[in-house]
Amino acid sequence: MKLVKNAVGRFVPTEVNGETQIPFKGVDKHKPTGVKAKPPIRSCIDYPEDGNKVVKDLKTALKKAGLKDGMTISTHHHLRNGDAVTNMLFDAVKEMRIKNIRWFPTASFPVHSHLIKYLEDGTIHHIEGSMNGPLGKFTTEGKMKGVGVLRSHGGRYAAIQDGEVHIDI
């Protein structure tokens, strides 16, 4: 891993999980280039004629969404420590034999300790977001296959807006 010294004297990696990183150069020393990320334009042709997008189960929904190895899955933290949905989501991902998922949550909670087995077997490659409780301990101990990227709620928004992270599902 190549390290360079940033503007505050810290050595930081030039690449994380295969993606080039720009070290902090100081205030007003770096001007990002590019455009904001944008979602595709949807129209009625993209949906069933009757308007009903409900499918029979989570695996069917993931298949229809085109889930493949290496994609980014984002989840929201509104259910907090009662979030069984994310656990069911990754149970389905595992059953589909999908690997190397980047999980991009707005937050994680102790209930997500269920996902450690998927970090161990490669279903989830790494997490970019908060890593609390047992997940935080697991990642702090260096057990995750990829490098965890700790993002604040606002930092997450900026990464999406600036196109640094593309959410697939």
Where in this protein do the model-derived segments appear?
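Conserved alpha/beta enzyme-core scaffold
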Residues: 2-169
